[in-house]
């Protein structure tokens, strides 16, 4: 259908699964570049509000998100590629949450790795749910709704100037 040889995927990627994994890895590389930016703000919370908004914007504006978070996301090759990419994002997120704990914005009771996995999984699922809605989701509204849940689940302290 794309006007190329059926053997192209096998020649360059070894298999159809290899091609799919390469596309998924490219998506997650672009996601990681956005999520791992240094955001401006006086407090951890101010920076994270900006990070959540940027990630939500990426998910909503990236055409492949609907496909990846939909039926394709259940294939074993996608889940395998996604797992490796998410492990890197969780590691970076854990460092970020640990910094929020050291700054006194977050309580130290939560394990940073578990908290990062929870936040990233919730962000993905909330976006997936919003994309299944017939109306196009609004970036700001969805980002705000997700941020409220993140802040509450992590126990963001009231006096943290968020």
Task: Label each residue range with its predicted role.
Residues 106-107:
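Conserved hydrophobic residue
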Residues 130-137:
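Transmembrane helix-loop junctions in multipass membrane proteins, especially transporters and channels
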Residues 69-77:
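Short linear capping/connector segments at secondary-structure termini
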Residues 22, 33-64, 112, 116-119, ...:
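Hydrophobic alpha-helical connector segments
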Residues 1-18, 22:
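Helix-turn-helix
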Residues 29-32, 57, 77-103, 113-117, ...:
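Amphipathic alpha-helical packing segments from all-alpha helical-bundle domains
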Residues 46-70, 84-95, 120, 151-159:
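Helical hydrophobic small-molecule/effector-binding pocket
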